[in-house]
Amino acid sequence: MSQQQIDAFINELAKQSKPYAWFEREFSAIDELEFVDFDLDNVKLLGLSVNLNAKNEISLKSKSTKIKDEIFCVVDIESTGSVRSGQIIEIGAVKVQNGKEIARFESLVRASEVPENISELTGITSKMLANAPHLPAVLNEFRLFLGDSIFVAHNVGFDYGFISASLDKCGFGVLLNQRLCTINLSRRLIASPKYSLAALKELLDIQTPHHRALADALSAANILQHCISKLPFYIKSTQDLLNFSKSTLKERKAMSEPVLLR
C-alpha cells in the first residue's frame, strides 16, 4: 500500500489550500485510487473531509475545525497476527466530541481458527467467532460508522494500516481519514517512564479491562481526552492538534512557550 503517497498528498493540503485541478491530479496519481471515480463525495466516503471555496480551491476541514467541534473516532482491533499473515477478529470504536462519547461500535469477526496465544491474550476463541459476521460485512459497517472523522488509536499505524489494507482487499478502497496517535500525543503532554496503554491506564487511573477491542478503544479515548485538556493555549484547530502530536521539541518551542507536563 502506498501510504507514503497518501500521507504526502494530505500533508501538502495541510500546508495550504490547493487548486481543484491539483487535488484531482494528485488524488488520481495514488496507486490505490487509480480506479476510483474522482469527485468530492467519493473523497468524503473514503474518509477525507475537505472544503471547496469560491476560488475553486480545496482545503482540509481540519484546518478550520475547532478541537471541541471535531469528531474523533478512537479505534482498537484484535487480530490473529500481522497484516500480512493474520486477520481482524474484533473491532471496537468510540466516537467522542467535546469530551463526550456520542457513539460506539463493536463487532467480532468470523474466523476459522484463533491461535492459542491470541485466545490467551484476548479471551476470544474460535467458538466465539463461529457465528460472527464475515469480515467484509463488518468492515462495511465500520466504515459507515467512521465516516470522515479523525481516526485515533494507541499506536495508530497498526490499527489504521490493518483496517485500511483489509478494506482495500475487500474492494472498499483504502482509508483517507486523517489519523492521530495517542502514544505520540502522550509523549508530548504526559510525563511517564512508559507509554504503553497499560502504563498510561495505571498512571491516569483508567479503570477498563484490557486486550478487548472496545475496552481498549475506551481507554485510548480517555487518554485522548486527558491530553486535550493539557494542550497549550495556542493549539486551537484539529490540524494544530495533529501537527502538535508529530512535532519535535524544537518545533514546539518555535510555536510558543514550553509545554507543561502533567
What are these regions (language model features)?
Residues 213-225:
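Acidic, divalent-metal-coordinating active-site segment for phosphoryl/phosphodiester hydrolysis
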Residues 2-7, 12-19, 36-37, 46, ...:
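Acidic two-metal-ion nuclease catalytic site recognized across multiple nuclease folds
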Residues 179-196:
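Short alpha-helix plus adjacent loop in nuclease-associated cores
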Residues 51-66:
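Short, cationic-aromatic polyanion-contact patches
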Residues 59-61, 70-164, 169, 175-176, ...:
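Conserved non-catalytic scaffold segment of RNase H-like nuclease domains
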Residues 22-36:
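Short helix-coil junctions and helix-kink-helix linkers
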Residues 79-81, 184, 219:
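Short, glycine/acidic-enriched loop or turn micro-motifs at the edges of active sites
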